[in-house]
Amino acid sequence: MSSSDKKKSADYYQKVEQGKEFANAGGIPPLLTGSQAQKDFAEVVRADILSSLIEFGDLDHALVLADNIRNAKDWIESRYLDYDAILERAEQIDRRNKESPV
């Protein structure tokens, strides 16, 4: 594994852990103050954390975060992400995890 792969992996697991912490705390708090650029960056971070949880297969925490985002479907689609594809991927991961538990 190259050093860049290790860094990507570490970043990925950090996002997963961060997502679990946010979910356990009731969700990711919205950024109410700051510049529009800071708010836009916060939205990207939210999407990144949510997608990392989905990819990891941690649907329980991902659903808490998705529920926490008002109008999650509109929110996700407004960021050029395909909501139906995300749900389909989450279901595939869930089925795979049930069929072959680690």
Q: What do these predicted ranges mean?
A:
Residues S2-V102:
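Charged, low-complexity intrinsically disordered segments and flexible loops
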